[in-house]
Design a protein with these regions (language model features):
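Aromatic/acidic polysaccharide-binding cleft in carbohydrate-active enzymes
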Residues: 1-39
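Structural beta-strand/beta-sheet cores of well-ordered domains, especially the beta-sheet scaffolds
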Residues: 2, 9, 32, 52, ...
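Carbohydrate-binding surface patches
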Residues: 4-7, 12, 48-86
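Membrane-interfacial catalytic/cofactor-binding modules of polytopic membrane enzymes
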Residues: 24, 30-63
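Hydrophobic, well-ordered secondary-structure elements that form the walls
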Residues: 65, 92, 115
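Extended, solvent-exposed regions of the mature portions of secreted/cell-surface glycoproteins
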Residues: 77, 93, 106-108
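Solvent-exposed beta-hairpin/edge-strand motifs
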Residues: 82-98
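C-terminal beta-strand-rich structural cap/linker in extracellular carbohydrate-active enzymes
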Residues: 102-123
């Protein structure tokens, strides 16, 4: 769902909604991620520096960044704020949890679970 939001694509569930797990339903009903997907700036995101694991998407009032871990184990992923054309004073929010994600020395760094995507917003 994170990449759907980064691509500003329609959010379509092609499963029986009456039998989905509570976790799946919670994911599909995430107000923050739906708002990101339906942001007024409808341009799709793009990879940062041709890195297929880190994407950036302009929003009407900010920016979204996704970090995707394709590995089979958790790993820390980071991106320089200058690569995102953002000032060092930028602070992020995790779109799934609503928690603040600090930046350090011009970098944003997060632990990403195996085969998962962290979705951050700023602005």
């Amino acid at each position: 769902m994170a990449m759907w939001a980064m691509l500003a694509a329609p959010l379509i569930a092609s499963c029986d909604l009456t039998t989905m797990s509570p976790d799946t339903l919670r994911t599909l009903r995430s107000a923050a991620v739906i708002a990101l997907d339906q942001d007024a700036d409808v341009r799709a995101g793009r990879p940062v520096d041709d890195n297929p694991e880190i994407w950036q998407r302009g929003l009407r009032h900010g920016v979204a960044v996704s970090l995707t871990n394709r590995d089979s184990h958790p790993r820390t992923m980071a991106v320089r704020l200058s690569d995102l054309d953002l000032p060092e004073s930028t602070t992020f929010t995790d779109a799934w949890s609503g928690r603040a994600v600090p930046t350090t020395d011009g970098w944003v760094s997060v632990l990403v679970a195996a085969h998962d995507t962290v979705l951050l917003t700023a602005g």
